[in-house]
Amino acid sequence: MTTEEDMRSSSSESSPKSFLSLPYDVVFNCLSRVSRTHDPILSLVSKSFRSLLALPDLEAERFRILKNETCLYVCLNLNNNNNPNPSWFILSQTPKHKLIPLPSLPYPDPHPNCSTVVSTGSEIYLLGGFVAKEKRSRRAYVLDCKSHQWRRLPKMRIARKEAAANVIDGKINVYGGCSSEYHNSVNWGEIYDPMTQTWEPFPEGALNKEGVIPCALIKDGIAFPDCGLLISGKVYDTTTMDTLDYNTPMDKLDLCPNVCMLKIDNQDFQASVSDGKLKLVRCRGAMAWHWTVGGLEELSCNYLLSVASPGGGRRVTVWWKTYTKECKTEIWCALILLERELVWGVIEWSENVFTLPGSESDSDSNSFLLHYELVTLARH
């Protein structure tokens, strides 16, 4: 005769075991072999998972096993009623290429528009931008790419939007983006020191333009020599400035959307998306050669919105949207290898990386891929 105690015992034995019920060493060993790109999803499972993922010992073991791991982070304007604010993702490589959502900015802060992004080490900095009533913001945030958590930083000294930024000697240098009252003052730029967590103006008389490189500007297929500036891989239009020299504050920089720089065989190229197609431009002096990349017939039925070259070499990613009959929006990405003297592209992969409800159409390529950063988590 089966007793009630036997039934409870049998039921207990047949119920599925939790992963966390395994010996600690087994759990630790398994998690150490999982790519960091999956951490945002794993952290949602339970508080126990979040605690495990935050362990310094786990990070050390991952560095030992996985060594360097390079991850692409993107900020997209989904322009969807369910996602009205820009959203950050990490692009997972395995088993399929998928965008994994990252946590939002610290509540209740909305994501600013026209902000500036720059990365150093395992951190991504988000600076300034427009907030309520399109006012410039002094706010600054940093994303820890190990824990995938945002935290607030001390506010900048001056409110800015669409500023330029780069990293010099481990410090964040921010240029321009301020109102006209600061255009001719030392406050047109400032420096953030992560060690002291303080903002300081540029030293008087020192414009800190290391890493700011003059480059050609392409408009409607015409090259304008030295009318652009290359800062952290981004191209800025300086044609609205009165003069361009190293004694003039960069107070009127305009970011050129959907343009990325490629360094191939010691030559500079600009990749861009125009009329839904991937195009390349090579500049030499006042001359410019531009062409549409061939070999991409598989993508010809899609209207490309954005291009990014996180590595700066022969590979670029292109992005576009499709809309389904089920009123869903699919975000697609393809990795393209440029070959045959860069006139031909080979599609290494092309996948639907994210699907969201709603099909609010928006083909404005200038406002889709807002930011991207390639972050390498290196073993120290």
Swiss-Prot record:
Question: This chain belongs to which protein, by name?
Answer: Putative F-box/kelch-repeat protein At2g44030
Domain F-box, by residue range, is: 16-66
Q: Which domain of life is it from?
A: Eukaryota
One matching Pfam family = F-box
- Which keywords label this protein? Kelch repeat, Repeat
User: Where are the annotated Kelch repeats, by residue?
Assistant: 123-170, 172-219
Q: Which Gene3D superfamilies match?
A: Kelch-type beta propeller
